[in-house]
From Swiss-Prot:
Protein location: Secreted
Alphabetized InterPro entries for the sequence: Conotoxin
Disulfide bonds, paired cysteine numbers: 53-67, 60-71, 66-75
Taxonomic source organism: Conus victoriae
Origin superkingdom: Eukaryota
Keywords tagged on the record: Cleavage on pair of basic residues, Disulfide bond, Ion channel impairing toxin, Knottin, Neurotoxin, Secreted, Signal, Toxin
Identification of the protein by name: Conotoxin Vc6.6
A Pfam cross-reference name: Conotoxin
Propeptide cleavage-removed residue intervals: 23-52
MF annotations from Gene Ontology: ion channel inhibitor activity; toxin activity
Amino acid sequence: MKLTCMVIVAVLFLTANTFVTAVPHSSNALENLYLKAHHEMNNPKDSELNKRCYDGGTGCDSGNQCCSGWCIFVCL
C-alpha cells in the first residue's frame, strides 16, 4: 500500500515537473501560437506546411530549397 502511494506521488510529481519545464519561458507563448495559426489560416500560401522542397538530384540555388538541407548545385 505504501509503495503504491509512493509510486502514484512520484508519477504525479514527474508529470507536473514535465509540464512546468516544457512550457516556453515566454509568458505569452500561447497567444503567439494562436496568432501564428490564425495568420496561416488567413494566408495558406505563407504556411510552413505548404513549403515545397526539392528531392535529391534536383538542381538548386541554396540549401533551404532542398528537403535534406544540403545543396551543391544539386540537392543531396
